[in-house]
Amino acid sequence: MIDPKKLFEDFLGGGAKQPGGKASGLPGNLGTLATGAVGGGLIGPLLGSKKVRKFGGKALGYGGAAVLGGLAYKAWQDWSAKRAPAPAQPPAQQPIPLPPPRSPFDLETQSAAGGGDARIAVVRAMIAAAKADDHIDAAEQRALFDRIGQLDLDTEEKAFVMDELAKPLDVAAIAALAATPEQAAEIWLASRLAIDPDDPREKAYLDDLAARLKLPEGLTAHLEAQAAAVV
């Protein structure tokens, strides 16, 4: 049985070990799997986003769930107070916000839609976002799965990641994971951190996801500001 806390923290802040260092030839975000673990977590080599690598480093000592929930909570507070989206600040000036215990932003105590664990929903969202700009053929998928087999995950966790990577991209299914507006904000923010939207397909994916999550008007800009603050 998958341990949601372990999988989530392994992805965002665990000590993954993997041979590598040479390019795998895989495209886009998924191709960085072969470059080795970065940011202290497994998701660094799986995804191409510089933001998520730095997020993994920031999550060390706090836990990825707490930091992600805190960033979404800060965005929600600023949006609710009708503040202008805050520009990114230098790391020394940027405190790590943490959500109140058992609040709607506390991923460790919340369930996703259908009763699943909210942390698993976030991992699914990040993997889906990584596929937004890629078309993986059968040979590339086999190479990617071989690399996943070398990661520090147990059998069920590897199977989960492989299954999520193999699924067709379905933004509606990802949006349906959110049980609350607060979870919708966290899912969008996690998806944003998983990619650097410099490709029109990535930007279109995030826009579509925001619409399907029914994020309140103006909130996305605040979530984007928090993503920009992860430096």
Please give the residue ranges for each predicted region.
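Primarily EF-hand calcium-binding motifs
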Residues: I127-A129
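Small-residue-enriched hydrophobic alpha-helices in membranes
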Residues: I2-R124, E140-V231
